[in-house]
Amino acid sequence: IIEMFLFNDIYNKDKEHFPEFAKEYTRRLIKKKMENPDLKVYVLSDENNNLYGAFEHPFITDMKNAGIDVIMVDIFKLKDTFPWYSPIWRTLIAPHGNPQGKGWIGNFYGPMWPKLTLRNLLRALNVKADHRKIFLNEENVVVSSANIHDPSYFHENVAISANGEITKDVLHGLQLVAEFSDGKIDVTEKQENKINFYMNILITIVFYQINSKSQSFFLL
């Protein structure tokens, strides 16, 4: 189970270039799922990865097509960041929907990304997000400051790994997030207690600094 704030490669590729970290991560998740069709893989994603409804990011589409359960976290059930704006948005703007693929406003991330509608932008102005970065398997949990995000590739990050009873608490929290987002993380007690079940899916992110630049590695 992965809960991830930034899971994308969205930036102006005409002006900058970063390693294709998010693409490679997506490829490896899909590869692992294809190798083990019965393996349950869940990705909880923040709406900013779809530019607040302007489109569905190809990484998300590819994961869904591979049988990975992608749950878009319903950030609009969270407490209002701007209580002077969100009630107005909910009353006057949200009822009109959030069109996808009908943009006419140039994308500030560059021309390689879909154009935006005014309603996409007004939706983003609620400034709500799921900032958590959690990786969980049957025995271990990793909580990190790192995003699966190309422009963040060289950032310095920290992470903590734990096992034992705490993993059940983390799982319960992830299940609650999925439930209020109209999704479901279907993990039974029997599955929780399996020993060495697909231990290769443990996602470990290690950050270290070389010549003042942090390098990101992951193991699937």
Question: Model-derived features: where do they sit?
Answer:
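Charged, low-complexity intrinsically disordered terminal segments
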Residues: 1-220
